[in-house]
A protein has these predicted regions:
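Hydrophobic/aromatic beta-strand patches that form the interior of the parallel beta-sheet core
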Residues: 2, 30, 103-105
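C-terminal catalytic/acceptor-binding lobe
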Residues: 81-156
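Short beta-strand-to-loop acidic/aromatic patch adjacent to the donor-nucleotide binding site
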Residues: 1-9
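Conserved catalytic core of nucleotide-sugar-dependent glycosyltransferases
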Residues: 11-86, 92-93, 97
Length: 156
């Protein structure tokens, strides 16, 4: 399953390369890295030069997120959240509990050309919704979410 926002610029040949590398490294959840001038909320999602892909402890909810079929029974359907803030740190905890490798594909960086964050909605309301959603649920703390487990420079 591939979830794509409406404000993302994908490079030529993106889909085949992205899915090939996500599959090659066995990522259960994957996202493309952000280009240098792309809006990225998390430093770990920024492109790393000379790296094809990285196994990380976190995959962001957007602007592009891929889910392997094996995750569907656990992660779908998505909860009824307005903005979805906090869902990705919860997914990261679930992935860790299940031993699922997750990661960022650096070889196909995208540009998230979004409007300024929270321009179309209340940032305070989104934060309150995230806090409410995460209360009583497992989630990966920010410091852990920023960690890279392994960097892959070749696909073989």
């Amino acid at each position: 399953l591939l979830v794509v926002d409406d404000d993302v610029a994908l490079p030529r040949g993106f889909l085949d390369r992205f899915l090939f590398l996500a599959d090659r490294f066995g990522f259960m959840l994957a996202q493309p890295a952000h280009r240098r001038r792309s809006h990225a909320a998390w430093r770990v999602t920024r492109r790393q030069p000379a790296v094809l892909a990285r196994e990380t402890r976190f995959v962001e909810i957007g602007p592009v997120t891929a889910f392997r079929r094996e995750t569907f029974g656990t992660l779908l359907p998505f909860p009824a959240l307005t903005m979805g803030w906090g869902l990705d740190v919860h997914w990261a905890a679930i992935a860790a509990e299940h031993g699922w490798p997750i990661g960022v594909i650096d070889a196909v960086p995208i540009a998230h050309v979004q409007r300024p964050p929270a321009a179309g909605y209340s940032r305070a309301a989104a934060l309150a919704e995230a806090e409410s959603f995460l209360a009583g649920r497992a989630y990966v703390p920010r410091a852990e979410a920023g960690q890279t487990v392994a960097a892959h420079r070749t696909w073989r």
